[in-house]
Amino acid sequence: MMPHQLSLVVGLGNPGSKYDGTRHNIGFMALERLARREGFSFRQQAKLHGLSADKGFGDQRLRLLMPQTFMNDSGRSVRAALDWYGFQPEEIVLLVDDMDLPLGRLRLRAQGSAGGHNGLRSTIQHLGTQVFPRLRIGIGAPAENPAERRARTVSHVLGPFSRAEQPCVDAVLDAVLDGLDRLKTQGMERAGTWINGFRYESPSAT
């Protein structure tokens, strides 16, 4: 069992209060939950184009980053952080929303394409590589209607979770934190097995 060298966790989203709690910002939500649990304090870092926080864990130091560049330019902030701290792409993990995954599911990958995600696309462009870990957080897809697909997609990802969905969202965010703990201590393969097998089950279904 080989632990993973995790130096930087990046949550992707859009800055500004009007985007708080939206599906596209679930990466921010996960990072904020991690910060609350571990006692991190974010501060604006102009040189990183984002909000950052760091804290020591034994002889290691973990850093968090929320780009404030808007989703489509997230890679500029990620690139700046890697250059400033001297990290390699393999030492980071991006937390991103995934419309192709149903709400209640997660997927960890060590590398891969953007898969239509603009934040991942920007990061790949700025880093010049697809080889960096990403944890995709399912947000579900809007009801299918080909004639209105684009409009429905935009309103879906920029819309809030419903009250009925909130218990699932809370459980998923807790699972993301659990998955990050496993990634640090158990390594990519074992953590991936647990993360990719996670499924939210409603208490009413048990």
Swiss-Prot record:
Gene3D superfamilies: Peptidyl-tRNA hydrolase. Keywords: Cytoplasm, Hydrolase, RNA-binding, tRNA-binding. It is an enzyme of class 3 (hydrolase). The keyword Cell membrane does not apply. TRNA binds at Y19, F70, N72, N118. It catalyses: an N-acyl-L-alpha-aminoacyl-tRNA + H2O = an N-acyl-L-amino acid + a tRNA + H(+). It is found in: Cytoplasm. The record marks N14 as: Discriminates between blocked and unblocked aminoacyl-tRNA. Its EC number is 3.1.1.29. GO terms for biological process: protein quality control for misfolded or incompletely synthesized proteins; rescue of stalled ribosome. One of its GO terms (molecular function) is peptidyl-tRNA hydrolase activity. The record marks D97 as: Stabilizes the basic form of H active site to accept a proton. Its main location: cytoplasm. One of its GO terms (cellular component) is cytoplasm. The active site is at H24. It comes from the Bacteria. HAMAP family: Pept_tRNA_hydro_bact (MF_00083). Hydrolyzes ribosome-free peptidyl-tRNAs (with 1 or more amino acids incorporated), which drop off the ribosome during protein synthesis, or as a result of ribosome stalling. Monomer. Belongs to the PTH family. PANTHER family: PEPTIDYL-TRNA HYDROLASE. This is Peptidyl-tRNA hydrolase.
